[in-house]
UniProtKB/Swiss-Prot annotation:
A GO-annotated cellular component: extrinsic component of membrane
Name of the protein: Glycosyl-phosphatidylinositol-anchored molecule-like protein
Gene name, Swiss-Prot/TrEMBL: GML
Main location: membrane
Record's keyword terms, sorted: Cell membrane, Disulfide bond, Glycoprotein, GPI-anchor, Lipoprotein, Membrane, Signal
Tree of life domain: Eukaryota
Subcellular location(s) of the protein: Cell membrane
Gene3D superfamilies found in the cross-reference section: CD59 (2.10.60.10)
Domain UPAR/Ly6 stretches: 29-134
Disulfide bonds listed in the record: C31-C55, C34-C42, C48-C73, C77-C104, C105-C110
SUPFAM superfamilies per the UniProt record, alphabetical: Snake toxin-like
Lipoprotein listed as a keyword: yes
Annotated membrane topology: Lipid-anchor; GPI-anchor
Amino acid sequence: MLLFALLLAMELPLVAASATMRAQWTYSLRCHDCAVINDFNCPNIRVCPYHIRRCMTISIRINSRELLVYKNCTNNCTFVYAAEQPPEAPGKIFKTNSFYWVCCCNSMVCNAGGPTNLERDMLPDEVTEEELPEGTVRLGVSKLLLSFASIIVSNILP
């Protein structure tokens, strides 16, 4: 009986404190909030509503050179689970408008940054030219002799 009274005396102040001081201990999650192109660094931070307990980062490929990066608060992270994702559309291949990188987390400003290999993925367009072997000429720079040889060979062959 004495043990029960001691336990009750120890727990009662904790229950009273949590009931009366709930407003001071409200979990106010803070997340980055932005929608930008090709940049995972977002300076804006917002305080999420009380019932929302997760931050998200979604990046979607717009085209081969641009990513739309969206960061905000969310209460639903099912988009990261394979079982919750919609099935693939049959017969259509989408080269753009697909997820590039997603993140869902539940701590203060946890959606900062993004993947570090973005620079390697977004390479500039460059033309690759191979060296021509000896004796060949570039298209449009052909010599008169090669033109005549081509005409003669095309007339000889059936």
